[in-house]
């Protein structure tokens, strides 16, 4: 019997974050970071961008992919904080 695993993509993560921010589950790190504001989120993005660079220079592809996923996560939280939709971002790709 084949097993299927749900793989998140950019759109599903954005929707998951939308739901989490709207529902505000107790103990959510996402909600806590969201509430701390733009400055806090900006620092997280800078931190993750640095970790992506270091991983690209010195670590495995798996570690690089993990760091890149974390950067994308924080970029999406920032987008939500500013009220951006995916269409706003996609219009510049």
Swiss-Prot record:
Task: Write down the EC number.
Answer: 3.6.1.31
Chief place of localization: cytoplasm
Where does this one sit in the cell? Cytoplasm
Cellular component per GO, a single term: cytoplasm
Entries under CDD domains matching the protein: NTP-PPase_HisE
One MF term in the entry's GO annotations: ATP binding
**Pfam family example for this protein?**
PRA-PH
Task: Name the pathway.
Answer: Amino-acid biosynthesis; L-histidine biosynthesis; L-histidine from 5-phospho-alpha-D-ribose 1-diphosphate: step 2/9
GO annotation, biological process:
L-histidine biosynthetic process
Q: Which UniProt keywords apply?
A: Amino-acid biosynthesis, ATP-binding, Cytoplasm, Histidine biosynthesis, Hydrolase, Nucleotide-binding
The source's superkingdom equals Bacteria
The record's catalysed reaction(s) read: 1-(5-phospho-beta-D-ribosyl)-ATP + H2O = 1-(5-phospho-beta-D-ribosyl)-5'-AMP + diphosphate + H(+)
Q: Which family does the record claim for this protein?
A: Belongs to the PRA-PH family.
HAMAP family from the UniProt entry: HisE
Q: Could you tell me what this protein is called?
A: Phosphoribosyl-ATP pyrophosphatase
Q: Which source organism does the UniProt entry give?
A: Corynebacterium aurimucosum (strain ATCC 700975 / DSM 44827 / CIP 107346 / CN-1)
Gene from which the chain derives: hisE
